[in-house]
């Protein structure tokens, strides 16, 4: 009987922790909170909050949950209205939903850059303190 129970337990556990299986059963608010928590974790674990003027920004797309998030540090939020990011998110998610992930992310990054250039122009005494590379995680 153990030879049936142990594999069954393993399969049940695996399915229960698999996002693809769980996603249809989770409330929208729970999915939003999970994505937001992962964005916060990425923001702080990559030290985006550690710039001199607190001007780090994270643009994140979570493909499994079909959600996106833009997090800006306090230096940016002091000058840029929060609803600015919602407009950019709407553009990005619209492109992603239509099947153009690359264009969605590129558009979001470009639009964020345009917003930031107004209040945070690049200068010689304000070097780029963090990497601008795109990071893809499973």
Task: Kindly label every feature range from the protein language model.
Residues 1-26:
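Transmembrane alpha-helices and immediately adjacent membrane-cytoplasm interface residues
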Residues 64-101:
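Flexible, solvent-exposed short loops/turns enriched in glycine
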Residues 19, 25-28, 32, 109, ...:
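Divalent-metal-activated hydrolytic enzyme cores
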Residues 101, 105, 111-118:
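Surface-exposed interaction patches
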Residues 38-72:
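Acidic, Ser/Thr-rich low-complexity segments on the non-lumenal side of membrane proteins
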Residues 78-87, 116-138:
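C-terminal binding/interaction regions
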Residues 25-45:
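Membrane-cytosol interface motif
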